[in-house]
């Protein structure tokens, strides 16, 4: 993969500001986002995670970047034990109210997850908000919360190795080799 040249290495303060700006975007548009994405069909992504899980469920699943809880509710309805995680307080409140599941209020750059707690981690269209310079560290944090033989599913919008703001929302759009 070609190295991104658009955003230079960021300081910890610049990372904090970038992260806060993106979360603030979702805070301001949480209800509109929930409505706009309610009917998105991600069943093939959910099935991809579940068919690769070992053993017999129900599974402990972390929905990383759960937003308003659409996929969290699907996992619960399927009989699993999902926990959500989102950096946006409005999404956390919406997801808790909608699903009655535990939802952690954490952002990707400051994860504090229990070691080996999950059979699976589902990150659907969320980790593209992690700056590429932090991605390896964040992936290591995710790996540490997975049980032995745990499954990590990640889906992100593709791009041409660019990091940019779309309005006030940061995204890293990577080319797949």
Where are these regions (language model features)?
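A short SAM/SAH-binding and catalytic strip from SAM-dependent methyltransferases
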Residues: 120-134
